Regions:
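A positional/architectural concept
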Residues: 1-68
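Cys/His-rich microdomains that often coordinate metals
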Residues: 75
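Charge-rich, low-complexity linker and terminal segments
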Residues: 1-10, 89-172
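Short beta-strand edge segments in extracellular beta-sheet folds
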Residues: 84-88
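Cys/His/Pro-rich metal-binding microdomains
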Residues: 68-69, 141
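Short Cys/His-rich "knuckle" micro-motifs
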Residues: 78-81
Length: 172
């Protein structure tokens, strides 16, 4: 897909703004991702001053059909994030970092696909669950919660007698 490439020749001095729509087909190329459905807008603001090229990449939208960690129902998650990267052209094969994105001098475009993907994945919530309602109750599937509670094995805490003896010591 060439949809996420910005031609270096199209970048004028000053600020240049590019917008990309991230839909479901975007994630087909990334097989190890648990994100398959999305409606996200990515905005790339390129600021060119002489040879210096600074990129501010912003994403805003919704990731759909993620599974709730508690009840496994599908949920949608809002996502908003921003990152700033310096783009440098080089003749060498250098590995890009979080702060610097290297582009070969022979290339005529910057491919933002991987950067956009990483920004989305790294800004997903760690715990994915239904939002709590105003009264504090969960939006989780009640039938599934009942099944989870029914089949959850409660572990009894067994203590080591050696530690129990130490607990009896009183330190002044």
């Amino acid at each position: 897909m060439n949809d996420f490439k910005i031609k270096l020749g199209a970048i004028n001095g000053g600020e240049n703004c590019f917008s990309f729509e991230i839909k479901d087909q975007f994630f087909e190329e990334f097989t190890l991702s648990d994100v398959e459905y999305a409606n996200v807008t990515a905005t790339a603001l390129l600021d060119k001053e002489g040879d210096r090229l600074a990129l501010t990449l912003t994403i805003d939208g919704k990731i759909n059909k993620l599974l709730c960690d508690i009840c496994t129902d599908e949920i949608s998650v809002d996502i908003t994030a921003e990152t700033k990267v310096i783009i440098k052209t080089t003749d060498e094969d250098l590995v890009s970092t979080d702060e610097i994105f290297y582009v070969k001098t022979s290339e005529n475009a910057i491919d933002l696909k991987q950067l956009i993907f990483e920004l989305i994945i790294l800004n997903l919530p760690k715990k994915r669950q239904h939002a709590l309602s105003k009264d504090g109750s969960s939006g989780c599937n009640k039938e599934m919660i009942e099944l989870v509670n029914k089949y959850t094995v409660k572990e009894e805490k067994s203590s080591d007698p050696r530690w129990d003896a130490l607990k009896k010591l009183k330190i002044k």
